[in-house]
Amino acid sequence: MTLEAIRYSRGSLQILDQLLLPQQSRYEAVGSVRQAWEAIRAMKVRGAPAIALVGCLSLAVELQAGAGGPGLAALVAFVQDALSFLVTARPTAVNMARAARDLADLAAQEAEREGATEEAVRERVICWAEDMLDKDLRDNRSIGDLGAHHLLKRAAPQGGKVTVLTHCNTGALATAGYGTALGVIRSLHNLGRLEHAFCTETRPYNQGARLTAFELVYEQIPATLIADSMAAAAMAHQGVSAVVVGADRVVANGDTANKVGTYQLAIAAKHHGIPFYVAAPSSSCDLRLETGREIVIEERPDQELTDVNGVRIAAPGIGVWNPAFDVTPHDLITGGIITELGVFAPEELQAALSATIS
């Protein structure tokens, strides 16, 4: 049985409430764009690809139920307004913003066709959102396979197995399935070339301890959980061959926004001479931004750092800074950026993808 973060059939969308994992596996119905926004904001669903999928599919559910209209102009306005609203839930991840732009443009173009009808435009928008699921899964499998083979050539050129360290959650729970960085680990395991995986707990939201560890145990992949503060020691003493992380936004020069804590992993990996990889679909690449300094970093509520499961663990009155992401400079991404289109050095990324994305 495969883990599913998203369950969808025409007119029905359910998400696995990831706030309850690993203690409970409970699916929650999402029947509107507003409900999707709230689920994304609360991090019941998370991971850049999954955010875009849930956002667009929630719109498809509303459209299937008859929302929008009457008339082409009103329908297009409804689609565009809904998509703009969804982008505000978690703005650092680019996938939702790109999907919103593309889908809004599609709706407008379809409405301008000669003989266009409200029913035809509605159907076209729904189908586009549904196609995202299949494409994401295909892309993730490509990322996993391309990344695994590139990593093996770099880290184990004489053969043998590798040990990989990863951060946050980038598996089936963050995507339509298989995963990005965790997909690379999965592919290595399927090839019989994975010695061991290390996953960080990923404070303050513990996505590594709650979600990645859950996936690794579920898939019976040999793995060990470590605290974030143990990563450099693991590189020094546990035979780590490579670090592979995901991304919420990769910009034109290769600077990468990912879960906070990624930057320090890249610094430690470079110090130890360990290749550091970013695994992300091309939909996570934003070539309109030149450097990471332009990325807007989301800041989360204080309570996510001061409280654990509703119990306060920090001294009352202490100040809190809680950014959800940090930016890893491109020169620290020494292994490469793994996409479904290939593995590229940061300086190669813009030329490689410019014909495909913007």
UniProtKB/Swiss-Prot annotation:
* First-level EC class: isomerase
**Positions of the site: Transition state stabilizer?**
168
Primary localization class, coarse: cytoplasm
Its GO biological process terms?
L-methionine salvage from methylthioadenosine
Query: Keywords on this record?
Result: Acetylation, Amino-acid biosynthesis, Cytoplasm, Isomerase, Methionine biosynthesis, Nucleus
Q: Which reaction does it catalyse?
A: 5-(methylsulfanyl)-alpha-D-ribose 1-phosphate = 5-(methylsulfanyl)-D-ribulose 1-phosphate
**Pathway membership:** Amino-acid biosynthesis; L-methionine biosynthesis via salvage pathway; L-methionine from S-methyl-5-thio-alpha-D-ribose 1-phosphate: step 1/6
Could you cite one Gene Ontology molecular function of this protein? S-methyl-5-thioribose-1-phosphate isomerase activity
Q: Which residues form a coiled coil?
A: none
Tell me which InterPro entries the record gives.
IF-2B-related, IF-M1Pi, IF_2B-like_C, Initiation_fac_2B_a/b/d, M1Pi_N, NagB/RpiA_transferase-like
- GO CC annotation: cytoplasm; nucleus
Catalytic residues (positions): 248
User: What job does the chain carry out?
Assistant: Catalyzes the interconversion of methylthioribose-1-phosphate (MTR-1-P) into methylthioribulose-1-phosphate (MTRu-1-P).
Under NCBIfam families, the record lists:
eIF-2B_rel, PRK05720.1, salvage_mtnA
Q: What is this protein called?
A: Methylthioribose-1-phosphate isomerase
Give the organism's phylogenetic lineage.
Eukaryota, Metazoa, Chordata, Craniata, Vertebrata
Gene for this chain: MRI1
